[in-house]
Amino acid sequence: MERMKKRGWLLAGVVAMTMAVTACGAQNNAGTPSGGSDAAKVKKIGIIQIMDHPALNAARDGFIQALADAGYKEGEKVTFDRQNAQNDQSVAKTIADKFVRDEDDLILAVATPAAQAVYNATKTIPIVFTAVTDPVKAGLVQSLDHPGTNVTGTSDAVPIGEQLKLIQQILPHAKNVGFLYNPGEPNSVVQLDQAKQVAPQSGFNLIPQPVSGLNDVKVATAQLTSKVDAIYVPTDNTVVSAIATVVATAKEKKIPVFGSEEGQVQQGALITKGIDYKKLGYQAGQLAVKILSGADPKTLPVETAKNLGVVVNLKTAQDLGITIPDSLLQDAKKIQ
């Protein structure tokens, strides 16, 4: 009888110790998902887009796709707080401040004004930008190869010399080229400066036409059509938002519009040798994956578009009575 009592006490002690160890382990696991790995927690990414138009939307979507392809599925390993500043810098500042308060793990900034807003708000949260033409002049990084700040990303700088060569090839007798832009956008001013440098080399007289907002685009385009043989549209957020208006207004006077990226050609511009913004955003997403895995943005070089291709709108060419040389059509992406 005494022996049975001892066995009972021993069994009870073993059970009690087992329960204590189990409870302790459960408590530790509750504090650190997947056995204590901080990397397993759901990442919070704030996305600020300066305004809504197809090129910027494509860049944003490409970024999200890159993260998904790397295993960061929305709602599982990452959440996105998508915000649009509606082309208002005060709204952009409010959004940037919100991301900082929320202690986001990373911020995507789409276009120069959005990137400047978030960089002004935080020097610690990693920032990845896309669709920024000159991040050095914008004050975001110290250099393209060595950012030196909490910012890196993908630039949409386009080879304007290549665009002007397209005009030469298609319109060999053209002399005057219009340049529609918003002087309030630093990215557009950079492109204008570049165009002024290379236009004379192509034998062109560049005629800049400023616009201050969307409501000015139609009138500005109409004014240009009486002075130029062709119109070039840079990656200007204001003008690109009204590209359909630019194309329609110019078409009335049989003036071709040359674009700086594929989205403009899809909406009626004649041709471009430019950027695929979804691919550019995808590159930015790949940089974000590196940062989420522990890389420091200040050591990740700024990237530019890896592949530039010719895109031509055949319907626009037909409507304008313009023949596209076979040398361009051979490898071009064709939009009917």
Model-predicted regions and their roles:
Residues 135-174, 276-295:
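Hydrophobic alpha-helical segments within soluble ligand-binding/sensing domains
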Residues 293-336:
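Hinge/cleft segment of the Venus flytrap/periplasmic-binding protein
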Residues 1-44, 69, 73:
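Short, low-complexity disordered leader/linker segments with a strong preference
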